[in-house]
Amino acid sequence: MAKEQVQAITKMEEDFAQWYTDIVKKAELVDYSSVKGCMILRPYGYALWENMQKVMDEKLKATGHENVYMPMFIPESLLQKEKDHVEGFAPEVAWVTHGGDEKLAERLCIRPTSETLFCEHFSKIVQSYNDLPKLYNQWCSVVRWEKTTRPFLRTTEFLWQEGHTIHETAEESQAETLNILNLYASFCEDYLAIPVIKGQKTEKEKFAGAKATYTIESLMHDGKALQTGTSHNFGTNFSEAFDIKFLDRNGKWQYVHQTSWGVSARMIGGLIMVHSDNNGLVMPPKVAPVQVVIVPIAQHKEGVLAKATELQEHIQKVARVKIDASNKTPGWKFNEYEMKGIPIRLEVGPKDIEKNQVVLVRRDTKEKEFIAMEQLEERIPALLEEIHNSLFNKAKVFRDENTYSVTKFEEMKKVADEKQGFIKAMWCGELACEEKLKEEVGVSSRCMPFEQEHLANECICCGKEAKQMVYWGKAY
């Protein structure tokens, strides 16, 4: 039996990176593949991605977006059409040079992102303003040859959705860019229980080839920031490079206004690092593959499994539920489902059946309560909502307690050295100051938040007139 015990994980206070790796492995989300930086998404991990995908897909379709699929391969000549774009991705591109034994006439890039393919397609199908807008989304995997990798957070191949839209006017494309950012923010907060900060990236941090990049940023348990999703307004940068024109309402040729936006399985990494603890994964209920697990106690005794099955039939009307009727001990099962982060555990044994009750245990707080069996259908949905709110509020309190406002350079340096979290400081808008803060303080600009605060008149770095408040931090 000793070999069957669920192994303990490294404590996050001792080694956060190892704690994270232990969770993704021991909660059976992923396994490593034989290709460096690639991961195998196991059934439990993929079910989590599917739940996230389902919600996002419904939200996108409800706002008029259509799913398409583009090829995996991009000809080198096509990738090079937008200069800033290709320079931004060149170091990470994987190339196909041979088909069988034959050398290809032109190298093919395995898509790191699909802007160029969408642009080529749009240039063929758009003639007039009547053809606009086009609101496309793609679910796929992309490849970026990363030097340092970690499951979900930074992998050579990763799953994502990428949206690509074209519009008649600059106002429409800007509205689309911000609407999608808001959709991402509400998904993070309302489904993953992760509080986010919405804002714009600086020129240095924006997407290669974009006119403007908007982001949602979250704070992880180790005080580092995670860019959880981005939405880009391209203006006419790509449409000019790819000659995507339409006849406007006055019979004149115009370039389309374009957007691009995406979120990836990196959100799963965020979910782990925001909510989980030293006992394993803590799953936000709304996306959890299993929301309730029933553990029969003394299941060999008459009536126990039958009662557990009866409870499952009632609960499955209101939640995703499973019974573990394996021959493992109850203690092993408790540890296993704690590690996997299932929000609610129900225990039912002979004594509970006599009293017409079950023992209910919350994963997030470990609180136990006795619930009458007939109340479960009503109690469980309410409790799942309660758990979601509790996780969100706990994460928000943590973020707020680890966000610091500074007005002097030395003060910023001290906070960055001694604390972990977001640092709010004023900035003049100059690249030189942004680079100096990266070099001397060790922080990057996370975003210029939409909700601005006036902390001082001067830039934290050079003392010149400040233009905006910026969130700074160490990041994944």
Curated annotation (Swiss-Prot):
GO cellular component: aminoacyl-tRNA synthetase multienzyme complex; cytoplasm
Molecular function GO terms recorded: ATP binding; catalytic activity, acting on a protein; proline-tRNA ligase activity; transferase activity
Catalytic activities: tRNA(Pro) + L-proline + ATP = L-prolyl-tRNA(Pro) + AMP + diphosphate
Keywords, alphabetical: Aminoacyl-tRNA synthetase, ATP-binding, Cytoplasm, Ligase, Nucleotide-binding, Protein biosynthesis
Family: Belongs to the class-II aminoacyl-tRNA synthetase family. ProS type 3 subfamily.
Free-text note on domains in this protein's UniProt record: Consists of three domains: the N-terminal catalytic domain, the anticodon-binding domain and the C-terminal extension.
Name listed for the protein in its UniProt record: Proline--tRNA ligase 2
Gene name, Swiss-Prot/TrEMBL: proS2
